[in-house]
Amino acid sequence: MVSTAGTTNIKQLTEANGARSLNINIIPAKDHAEAFLMVETDRAVAFVMDDILLASLIAGSKAPDDYVISKDAFSKPEPYGIMLRKDDPAFKKVVDAATAALYTGGEAQKIYDKWFTQKIPPKGLNLNVPMGSELKSEFAKPSDSPDPDSYK
């Protein structure tokens, strides 16, 4: 299996390999393109990476129908965040309110659909990744928790 060097994905794969005694040969690739090429050219049987990144590589490949992304999660979701000044609660309150309004008001769904379920310029690629239940749940009730378990 291949994954991109320096990512949390290769770290998680390595940890699971050891903890579960899977005996997987893990190949670190220098970047996502090299990792995908290794699967494309049969030098690796699978590529472990974030589903959206995999979807974009598949959509841009020569034969998108030759690939599938597993539905089973390899790990807990990793929350993304917005970095802001630590000691500015007034600004954090404004950011929290603005993002909550975006998520709960339906605009986030429109933005998501634009980039993940429709053709994207300039090449017209469609990632065909409908919003998952965990993200829908998070949009309905936004949180700033860094705990992956809070996103189930």
Give the role of each language-model region.
Residues 12-17, 40-41, 45-76, 115:
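A ligand-binding cleft/hinge motif common to bilobed small-molecule-binding domains
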Residues 59-96, 118-143:
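Periplasmic-binding protein-like
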Residues 1-36, 51-55:
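Bilobed "Venus flytrap"/periplasmic-binding protein-like clamshell domains
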Residues 3-8, 29-33, 48, 85-93, ...:
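Soluble non-cytosolic domains of exported or imported proteins
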Residues 3, 40-44, 84-85, 97:
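Second-shell loop/turn segments in exported
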Residues 8-17, 99-152:
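Ligand-binding clefts/hinges and TM-proximal coupling segments of bilobed small-molecule sensing domains
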Residues 56, 93-94, 110-111:
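Short, solvent-exposed alpha-helical surface patches in well-structured domains
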